[in-house]
Amino acid sequence: MMAAPLIWLMMLSLPASPPEIDYKKIFGSDYTWAVNWLKQNDAVIDDYAVKYQLPAKELKAIVFPELIRYNGVFNALEVESLKYLYVSEGKHYANFSVGYFQMKPSFAEMVESDALQLPVGQWMKSAGWKDVSVDTEAGRRERVLRLCNTRHQVLYLCLFYKICESKFQGRTFRSPTDRLKFFATCYNAGYHLSEKSILSFQTKNNFLQYNYSAISAFYYLNEED
């Protein structure tokens, strides 16, 4: 007769799971702005997702934290100055975040180069991209123009997703949310890292003092598509 009370006491002594962080409350108006931006641009993202058979909600969730940051830190004058420096001198002199998805020129260069090694490289040609993976002043100018265009940023995002699928095709994901958190970390930390490094990075709070992949998952699980 003592077994049941003993088990109950043992259960009470177990540490409670930490409560889920409410990122909507933490980021306030920046969170709301990011949600509204995605709703207003649903058509663009959904068009590409349908065209290339990609999960639209995951694409949105991957860049959602960057939209929060964009609304909080965007400085038009600084970005214009850095764009000029990148075009004239290259990524080693100016590797800045640009556009709603806060993509860096070095990221765009890497995506272009890696996509050319896969069948999805054809997507860039179909989109009319010029000077792809070319590190000349003309090539960098074209790249900046693409990064400043929302439709082209969405295409970069789609290419990134397919590159991650290819690179980590041997990894088994427990659920779409598990895959989302891994790919979101790839976006934040860099998909060029090893799988072990990405998994380690996924546990860290280094995005506005919070966890990038957790913010992505919060949007994915709590906001309507």
For the regions a protein language model found, what residue spans apply to each?
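N-terminal cationic amphipathic segment used for targeting or macromolecule association
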Residues: 1-2, 47
